[in-house]
């Protein structure tokens, strides 16, 4: 999971992921058109994203297509975000219930 966090720590790599989210299955050239980076920089960032399993490559003939792989992001969500979110939602639910009970007792 550390490799995923390291990959996500860079703004340029997050921009690449955002671009793939907008239009999945892009070639290197297509990605370069939408980003203010050299072809070499995009290639470097894509390799790091592939190593983190955030991007997968599919060859279509001579074209190398890059696809966003959401699985590592989902794993982060489940491990780090989801578990804290559940507690907050439960606390809000308990607060709402308590306020409603208090209102009913007074009214």
Feature-to-residue mapping (PLM):
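Alpha-helical residues within the helix-turn-helix
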Residues: 33, 44, 50-51
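Beta-hairpin "wing" of winged helix-turn-helix
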Residues: 51-61, 67
């Amino acid at each position: 999971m550390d490799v995923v966090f390291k990959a996500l720590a860079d703004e340029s790599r997050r921009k690449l992921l955002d671009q793939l989210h907008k239009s999945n299955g892009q070639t290197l050239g297509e990605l370069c058109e939408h980003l203010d980076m050299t072809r070499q920089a995009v290639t470097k960032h894509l390799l790091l994203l592939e190593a983190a399993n955030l991007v997968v490559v599919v060859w279509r003939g001579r074209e190398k297509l890059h696809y966003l792989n959401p699985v590592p992001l989902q794993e982060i969500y489940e491990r780090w975000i989801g578990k804290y979110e559940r507690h907050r939602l439960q606390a809000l639910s308990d607060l709402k219930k308590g306020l409603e009970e208090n209102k009913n007792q007074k009214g």
